UniProtKB/Swiss-Prot annotation:
Sites of Phosphoserine modification: 85, 240, 309, 327, 343, 390, 409, 421, 498, 515, 527, 620
Entry annotated with the keyword NAD: no
InterPro entries noted in UniProt: Nab2/ZC3H14, Znf_CCCH
Cross-referenced SMART domains: ZnF_C3H1 (SM00356)
Entry protein name: Zinc finger CCCH domain-containing protein 14
Similarity comment text for this entry: Belongs to the ZC3H14 family.
Ranges of compositional bias, category Basic and acidic residues: 412-426
Lineage, top ranks: Eukaryota, Metazoa, Chordata, Craniata, Vertebrata
Family matches, as Pfam families: zf-CCCH_2
Chief location: nucleus
Length: 735
């Protein structure tokens, strides 16, 4: 039951890591679904069909990997000792799941046969230990492939010491090579909660081959102390092996020493896993055990496997080991969590610049919102508490001050102890705010006077309320008497302007003569957007009463306000809901920017005034074009004329970019005056009057030679002389 739970948890961890590597991990539901399919013994084709919706193009790759791991688990035995070792080697983050390793039970079994001899090193420089492993890449058919001659892979984790080493100690730095392919199935270690702690690896060189002693926290303790070991020491006084063991006893950390055995024995070793998938109650126990084991030390394994086909490399290492003499062994520290590698390809990863920009903008927005406290529409200055604005309240508090002075004893002493730092901090804040708001020096002196006046009062009451600086748009509360002598004169003005009620205090007012107290208004200084607090709204709505403009308000500092602003204030007090402010703003905008005339600018679109032009500039296209009857006076956009300035058509409906030169107007065509009467002129065709009102027929161009019988034009008739003219008479002669 325990072993099956552990194995199923490991498989689930590996599945989750693989999904994260493929970029398909969203939540815990997909690993749960895959575990159910594994428990139901789904085939690879069935898993590919079911998971294609979630994994897409990576489905075949994932199912091949998963079934390779499951086939590996089915092919091994169910020996409990080998189960735990194979569990470590298959699912550990430091070696791939398909590497050939050895179990810790077999390590202990062969420990007596090959006892390592402690050989110290006299070389002060740092060395790099060549840890050779036979790596296989998991394929669809689980075919094991060995690397080329001399190719050795190194462990993924970067090894660095857990403590400062003496100059005579050797530090072995084990880093991955660029050509390593051992990260295929190891990305799930990044999410493994058991890989959060570090392990200590001590290297002891034997007479013939180097062996690695690995310290782990198992269930039983190995008390073999024949070798000289350098362990992790949490206190500087514990420098010996005995002190390190005492520390292990106190902190309940148990270590186990494992050594490499002979290569012939290594070749015969096989580790097995037998998956057990039970009921839902067992799955619940898996989750509980997972939560419980997160607090346990990491169980990891560092394996060194020699490739015995290369005799030259072995002899070289033997010679190197033989040249090391001394009694100091090398201490290697392995950080359990490897450097995180991104599970997505670089093309699909989020842009880091966008993330950094979003973080910076979020921080800026947070700082901007926190600078304005809760009342975001007002700018606060920590100068003095708010004051009452009616003379009656002031006189009542001054009269009551004599009887209440004995009540201020211990608070004053406590405040005086912190007075220096508080005053200094308030002064700094005041200077910063004054410089930021660019307040007039006279107003700054006024604020300083008010600060001095209320120093004792703020200590007495421990009042944290702030002096309110307001824009004239809000309630401008104008202020108190310049002295008690002139107090009665300004009391009427205060009472007239006391529409804004201030929260009353029942604590003591100091017995001091009245000093000038002012409220500075920020005219033209921008204020952060926001709205009045609930307290301000209540005070404005409940305490507003119609205010009359006092005649004496222009005397003293009250006269600093512009008369127009005073009228605005009195009208605003009568209108607490803010509708007056909107009307005022609209009036100001009208005064500043006159309304445009509904007449098209004759210089558009070449008008140089732009938006400041008093005439209309068309924006949207005309829907009635080309049948628009307004032509160039239309308030909408017409297409440009291709003749532009050379266009001579006076009523051209197109838009002319350049100004047209006014051409000469065409001469009006005078139509011939119709005849006043259709009566034929009696003198025709001999009429010689040019303005003859009678009808004169038009002559035929062919005159007497016209042969058309139906010719409508006039043909002159040939006149025959009268008859008496044709009679010949013999002239009379005298005989």
């Amino acid at each position: 039951m325990e072993i099956g739970t552990e194995i199923s948890r490991k498989i689930r961890s590996a599945i989750k890591g693989k999904l994260q590597e493929l970029g398909a991990y969203v939540d815990e539901e997909l690993p749960d679904y895959i575990m159910v399919m594994v428990a139901n013994k789904k085939s690879q084709d069935q898993m590919t069909e079911d998971l294609s919706l979630f994994l897409g193009n990576n489905t075949i790759r994932f199912t091949v990997w998963l079934h390779g791991v499951l086939d590996k688990l089915r092919s091994v035995t169910t020996d409990p000792a080998s189960l735990k070792s194979s569990d470590t080697n298959l699912f550990d983050g430091n070696v791939p799941s398909n590497k050939s390793s050895f179990s810790r039970g077999d390590e202990r079994r062969h420990e007596a046969a090959v006892p390592p001899l402690a050989v110290s090193s006299t070389r002060p420089e740092k060395r790099e230990s060549r840890v050779s492993t036979s790596s296989q890449e998991q394929k669809a058919t689980n075919v094991r492939q060995t690397y080329d001659d001399g190719a050795a892979t190194r462990l993924m984790s970067t090894v660095k010491p857990l403590r400062e080493l003496a100059p005579s100690e050797d530090v072995i730095d084990i880093k991955p090579e660029p050509d390593d392919l051992i990260d295929e199935d190891l990305n799930f270690v990044q999410e493994n909660p058991l890989s959060q702690k570090k392990t200590t690896v001590t290297l002891t060189y034997g007479s013939s081959r180097p062996s690695i002693e690995i310290y782990r926290p198992p269930a039983t303790r190995n008390t073999d102390s024949g070798a000289h070991l350098n362990r992790l020491q949490f206190q500087q006084q514990q420098n010996s092996i005995h002190a390190a063991k005492q520390l292990d006893i106190q902190s309940s950390r148990v270590y186990e020493t494992g050594r490499l055995c002979e290569p012939e024995v290594l070749n015969s070793l096989e580790e097995t896993y037998s998956p057990f998938f039970r009921s839902n109650a067992e799955k619940m126990s898996i989750e509980e055990e997972n939560f419980r084991k997160r607090k346990l030390p990491v169980v990891s394994s560092v394996v060194k496997v020699k490739k015995f086909s290369h005799d030259g490399e072995e002899e070289e290492e033997d010679d190197d080991c033989g040249s090391r003499t001394g009694s100091i062994s090398s201490s290697v520290s392995v950080p359990a969590k490897p450097e995180r590698r991104p599970s997505l390809p670089p093309s699909k990863q989020a842009n880091k610049n966008l993330i950094l920009k979003a973080i910076s903008e979020a921080q800026e927005s947070v700082t901007k919102t926190t600078n304005y406290s809760t009342v975001s529409q007002k700018q606060t200055l920590p100068v003095a508490p708010r004051t009452r604005t009616s003379q009656e309240d002031l006189l009542a508090e001054v009269a009551q001050g004599h009887g209440r002075v004995p009540r201020i004893s211990s608070p004053v002493k406590e405040e005086e102890a912190q007075g220096g730092s508080v005053d200094e901090r308030q002064g700094t804040q005041q200077r910063q705010l004054l410089s930021r708001l660019q307040i007039d020096p006279v107003m700054a002196e006024t604020l300083q006077i008010s600060q001095d006046y209320y120093d004792m009062e703020s200590m007495v009451h421990a009042d944290t309320r702030s002096f309110i600086l307001k824009k004239p748009k809000l309630c401008e509360e104008l202020v108190v008497a310049a002295s008690q002598a002139s107090g009665m004169e300004t009391a009427d003005a205060l009472q007239a302007r006391s529409g804004h009620l201030v929260q009353t205090r029942d604590l003591v007012q100091p017995d001091k003569p009245a000093s000038p107290k002012f409220i500075v208004t920020l005219d033209g200084v921008p204020s952060p957007p926001g709205y009045m607090s609930d307290q301000e709204e209540d005070m404005c709505s409940e305490g507003m009463r119609p205010a009359q403009h006092p005649a004496a308000s222009h005397g003293g500092l009250a006269g600093l306000l512009h008369p127009q602003r005073s009228r605005v204030l009195s009208r605003q007090l009568e209108d607490p809901d803010g509708s007056f402010a909107n009307a005022e703003m609209s009036e100001l905008s009208v005064a500043q920017k006159p309304e445009k005339l509904l007449e098209r600018c004759k210089y558009w679109p070449a008008c140089k005034n732009g938006d400041e032009c008093a005439y209309h500039h068309p924006v949207s296209p005309c829907k009635a074009f080309p049948n628009c009857k307004f032509a160039e006076k239309c308030l909408f956009v017409h297409p440009n004329c291709k003749y532009d300035a050379k266009c001579t058509k006076p009523d051209c409906p197109f838009t002319h970019m350049s100004r047209r030169t006014p051409g000469l107007p065409p001469k009006p065509v005078t139509a011939p005056a119709p005849p006043s009467s259709s009566q034929l002129c009696r003198y025709f065709p001999a009429c010689k009057k040019m303005e003859c009102p009678f009808y004169h027929p038009k002559h035929c161009r062919f005159n007497t030679q016209c042969t058309r019988p139906d010719c409508a034009f006039y043909h002159p008739t040939i006149t025959v002389p009268p008859r008496h003219a044709l009679k010949w008479i013999r002239p009379q002669t005298s005989d």
